[in-house]
């Protein structure tokens, strides 16, 4: 008999910046994540497919196809609703937006109605001047980022060999370069203003590959990060609460859920009683032989 796969259940899951088509992504971790979650709504908040990478030196791998199939399986088997929001790397979708078929909706922006609050959900590239006004610079930067990730992978292999923890070169660069830090702050402030204009209590976006969860002038700002480095998502629990969940935290929760599912407390108690009884019987037999 086939054992049913253990999954973590959520009301809504928000993913962004998976960049399928880039050579260096966390695709294996993403596939593991998708195969062990269940949700009513899955929001793909932009840059799900990296059209820029596929036009250049990118590569579509079998793991990327499996990712798409996992999502379609969620739609077919679990009746999950998928909302796919256009990003700047998959801007080819602009030609067909908006479009809805079956339980899949592809659009520019989306209003998520939580249990108590409303959130404006969009990729966020519309507030990035490099993406909107200097697109050619953004494309060059994308190529450089891909190459940096490739070098970072080999560098971390060396660090692992030396017994050291992985190191993110891009995160280090973002923290050190003052202009990059200021760019992130301006970006976040602009998004908060847009949320107010849409009469929303919060904003959920991606684009800048920096996971965040904070209040900006009364607006709940959330960024899901990415699946290139941070490997993180935003999950909405059944009670409506939202939190950022990175891959390591997800694996820990999944392990705890598996233990609770396959080895509940009652089973441990009954098993210990059986073991104790058998040990007592064996001890009595040994004593009788002596």
Placement of each model-derived feature along the sequence:
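Nucleotide/phosphate-binding catalytic cleft detector across ATP-hydrolyzing
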Residues: 1
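Active-site neighborhood of phospho(di)ester-bond hydrolases with catalytic His/Asp-centered motifs
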Residues: 15-16, 42-46, 82-88, 121-122, ...
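Binuclear metal-dependent phosphoesterase catalytic core
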Residues: 112-115, 215-290
């Amino acid at each position: 008999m086939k054992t049913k796969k253990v999954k973590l259940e959520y009301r809504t899951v928000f993913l962004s910046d998976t960049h399928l088509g880039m050579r260096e992504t966390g695709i294996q971790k993403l596939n593991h994540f998708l195969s062990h979650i269940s949700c009513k709504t899955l929001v793909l908040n932009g840059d799900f497919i990296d059209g820029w990478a596929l036009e250049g030196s990118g590569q579509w791998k079998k793991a990327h196809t499996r990712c798409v199939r996992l999502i379609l399986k969620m739609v077919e088997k679990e009746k999950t609703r998928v909302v796919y929001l256009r990003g700047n790397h998959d801007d080819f979708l602009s030609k067909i937006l908006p479009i809805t078929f079956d339980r899949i909706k592809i659009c520019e922006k989306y209003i998520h109605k939580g249990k108590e609050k409303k959130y404006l959900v969009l990729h966020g590239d519309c507030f990035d001047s490099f993406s909107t006004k200097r697109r050619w610079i953004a494309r060059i930067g994308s190529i450089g980022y891909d190459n940096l990730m490739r070098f970072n992978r080999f560098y971390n292999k060396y660090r692992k060999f030396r017994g050291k923890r992985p190191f993110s070169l891009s995160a280090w660069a973002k923290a050190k370069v003052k202009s990059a830090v200021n760019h992130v702050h301006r970006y976040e402030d602009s998004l908060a203003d847009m949320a107010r204009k849409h009469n929303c209590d919060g904003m959920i976006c991606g684009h800048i590959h920096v996971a965040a969860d904070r209040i900006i002038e009364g607006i709940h700002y959330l960024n899901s990060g990415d699946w290139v480095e941070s490997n993180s998502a935003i999950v909405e629990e059944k009670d409506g609460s939202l939190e950022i969940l990175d891959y390591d935290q997800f694996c820990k929760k999944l392990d705890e859920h598996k233990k609770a599912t396959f080895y509940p407390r009652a089973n441990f108690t009954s098993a210990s009683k059986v073991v104790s009884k058998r040990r007592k019987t064996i001890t009595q037999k040994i004593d009788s032989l002596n």
